[in-house]
Swiss-Prot record:
Source organism per UniProt: Homo sapiens
Biological process per Gene Ontology, one example term: positive regulation of potassium ion import across plasma membrane
Positions bearing carbohydrate: N124, N240
Gene from which the chain derives: ATP1B3
Top-level taxon in the UniProt lineage: Eukaryota
Disulfide-linked positions: C128-C144, C154-C170, C191-C250
UniProt keyword annotations, A-Z: Cell membrane, Disulfide bond, Glycoprotein, Ion transport, Membrane, Potassium, Potassium transport, Signal-anchor, Sodium, Sodium transport, Sodium/potassium transport, Transmembrane, Transmembrane helix, Transport
Positions on the Extracellular side per record topology: 57-279
Ribonucleoprotein listed as a keyword: no
The UniProt record lists the keyword Transferase: no
Protein name: Sodium/potassium-transporting ATPase subunit beta-3
C-alpha cells in the first residue's frame, strides 16, 4: 500500500485492536506485562520516596515549633486596638435613637462580646492583686477576673441598651493579645473627641486605666479563660448635635514600651472611629 492510499475502516480498527492487545506477543498498549510491572514499580518507589521525604521534612520542622507558644514574636512588639460592636461599614457607627432596629445589631454584638465577662462566667477565675504584673511559672496558669462593673454605664448591667436608646452610645476598646507582653509604667487607653464642640466623651474605667495584673498573657492553650482588660467610651450627644458626625480617637498611653506612634504604621496602638446619632 502506497502513502497516497488510505486505510480502510476495518484495517484501522484491526490495527487499534492489535495495539490495545497483541495476542501474539502478549503486549497491552505496546508493552508486555513485565514492562508494565517495572514501570509501575518505578513510579511507586519514586513517589513513595517523595512522600516520605516530604513527611520527614515536615516532621523535622514541626520539632522546632512549640505547640503552645509561637516561635517568632519579635515582629509584633506593640499591640493594636480593636473596637466593639463591629461596625457595619469601615469604622463608622450610624443609628437613630427613635428606631430600635437601627442599633439592635450593635446591642446584640455587645451582649455577645461581654458574655464571658459576666459574673456567672467568671466565677472560676482568680481575684488577682491590683497594680502589679501577675507573672506565673506554670504548668497551670490562672486567669484574672475582670469586674464588668468597671465599665460603669457601659457595662450593660443597668442599661441593657448600652446608651443607644438615649443617644449616648457605648463603644468598647481593647488591646490585641501579645504573648509575654509586660507593659511598663501605668498603661491606659486615652480616648478624645476630634470635634471641639462635642467635648462630652466619658471613658471607663476612670482615665481608661488598664491594670498590670492582666499581663503577661501566656497564650490561648496555656492561659485558658484569659479575659482581656476593656475600656469603654461613651459619647453623649446633645439635642443640638443630633445628626452630626463625631470622630473619636483612642490610643495607648502611659507606657514606655507600648507605642502609639509609628512612621510605618499609623494605626499602631491607636484606632479612630466615627459615630452619627440621629433623632
Amino acid at each position: 500500500m502506497t502513502k497516497n492510499e488510505k486505510k480502510s475502516l476495518n484495517q484501522s480498527l484491526a490495527e487499534w485492536k492489535l495495539f490495545i492487545y497483541n495476542p501474539t506477543t502478549g503486549e497491552f498498549l505496546g508493552r508486555t506485562a513485565k514492562s508494565w510491572g517495572l514501570i509501575l514499580l518505578f513510579y511507586l518507589v519514586f513517589y513513595g520516596f517523595l512522600a516520605a521525604l516530604f513527611s520527614f521534612t515536615m516532621w523535622v520542622m514541626l520539632q522546632t515549633l512549640n505547640d503552645e507558644v509561637p516561635k517568632y514574636r519579635d515582629q509584633i512588639p506593640s499591640p493594636g486596638l480593636m473596637v466593639f460592636p463591629k461596625p457595619v461599614t469601615a469604622l463608622e457607627y450610624t443609628f437613630s435613637r427613635s428606631d430600635p432596629t437601627s442599633y439592635a445589631g450593635y446591642i446584640e454584638d455587645l451582649k455577645k462580646f461581654l458574655k464571658p465577662y459576666t459574673l456567672e462566667e467568671q466565677k472560676n477565675l482568680t481575684v488577682c492583686p491590683d497594680g502589679a504584673l501577675f507573672e506565673q511559672k506554670g504548668p497551670v496558669y490562672v486567669a484574672c477576673q475582670f469586674p464588668i462593673s468597671l465599665l460603669q454605664a457601659c457595662s450593660g448591667m443597668n442599661d441593657p441598651d448600652f446608651g443607644y436608646s438615649q443617644g449616648n452610645p457605648c463603644i468598647l476598646v481593647k488591646m490585641n493579645r501579645i504573648i509575654g507582653l509586660k507593659p511598663e509604667g501605668v498603661p491606659r487607653i486615652d480616648c478624645v473627641s476630634k470635634n471641639e464642640d462635642i467635648p462630652n466623651v466619658a471613658v471607663y474605667p476612670h482615665n481608661g486605666m488598664i491594670d498590670l495584673k492582666y499581663f503577661p498573657y501566656y497564650g490561648k492553650k496555656l492561659h485558658v479563660g484569659y479575659l482581656q482588660p476593656l475600656v469603654a467610651v461613651q459619647v453623649s450627644f446633645a439635642p443640638n448635635n443630633t445628626g452630626k458626625e463625631v470622630t473619636v480617637e483612642c490610643k495607648i498611653d502611659g507606657s514606655a514600651n507600648l507605642k502609639s506612634q509609628d512612621d510605618r504604621d499609623k494605626f499602631l496602638g491607636r484606632v479612630m472611629f466615627k459615630i452619627t446619632a440621629r433623632a
